[in-house]
Amino acid sequence: NEQDIYIDAWRHVWEAFKDDDFVIGYDLVNEPRKLTMDISYDELTNRYLLPFYEKIIDAALPYSKDKQFLIQSIFMNKGDAVKRNQYHEIKKKINHKNLVFAPHIYQENLDYIEPTMQRFEKESTLLNAPILVGEWGFPTFVTTDNSTTEQLNYIEFYIRTAEVFDRMGIGAIKAWFLGNRSYQNFLPGGESTWAIFSDKQAVGTVERKYITDIIARPYPQLIAGDIEQFMFHFATRTLDLSIQTDNSRGASKLFIGADRHYPDGFTIHIGEQLILSKSPLSMGFKVHHSEANIDLGNFVWDESRQQFVVLAWPKDKSQLSIQIKPGIYKKTDPMAKNN
C-alpha cells in the first residue's frame, strides 16, 4: 500500500493549496530511483513510474483541474549514465494534460550540455509538455572560492548552460539558493556545497559572484505578446529580444539587473521608434530618440526590482526588436562616418 500512503500524503497538500493561485503545480516525485531493484530502467519507467504518475494525477484532479503536474524521469545509479546524462529517457506518453516535464541537469562538461538538453526536448515533445528545469548548477568545490582558474571554469560552463536555456526559451531553478552551507563529499573533486553564498549565516550576503552573476542575468520576465527569441550575450553584456506585441495582455517587465551588470549605465533600443538610456546617477530614463505620438509615460524604471516596465508597446500587434546595451547612448557624428 505504499503508493496509496504516498497519495494520501499528497491529499493534504492538494487540499491546502487547491484555491491558492500562487501554487501553480506539484512536483510529484523528486528524482525517482531504481537503486538495488533487479529491473531495467525501461521496465521500471513503463511498468511502474508512468502508471504511478497517472494514478497520482487522477487522485489530484478532483481538488483542482487547473494545477500543473511536474514529472521527472528515473535518476539512474552511479555508473549508469548515458552520454553523461544521469536521467533515463522517457519513451512513452502519459495520458494526461497539464503536464510539465521537469528534468534536472548538473553538467559541467561543455560538450554534453546541449546534447543533454536536446534529449530533454525530445521527451518534452513526446509528452506534449513544456520544460521547466527543476534543478541545475554544478556544486562548488571547497577549493573554488580561492582559485581564479576554477572560477573561470565555472563561469564558462554556467554561461553555456544559461545560453542553452535561453535559446530554448525555458525556465530553470538553480539549486539551492541559500544552501545547505555545509560541505558534502560525494564527487571525485572532493568536498562541495550547493550554496551560492560563502558566509555561514542562514541568509547569506557574500555572493559567489562567479555563479550569481550568471543566474541573475537580464531576461524578459513578463511580456505582453509572444516571445520569438531572446539571448543575453555575456561577453558584450547585450540583451537581444524579439517579440510579437499584444498590448491587450497588460504590462511587460524586463529584468535588467543594472546594479550588477550595468554599473556604467545602459541604453535601450525599442525598434526604430525609441532610444532610452539610464545612468546610475539618475532616477529615470533619458530620451535620445522618440517617434511622434509615443507616450513616454509608458516606460518606467523600477529601481527596487531592477526592472524595465513597459505599460504599452509603441506598436501593437506587430513584430518588435528590443536591445539593451551597456553604457549611455552617444549619437554618432555624421561627419565622422563620412571621413
Ranges and model annotations:
Residues N30-E43, N98-N109, E121-I155:
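Active-site clefts of carbohydrate-active enzymes
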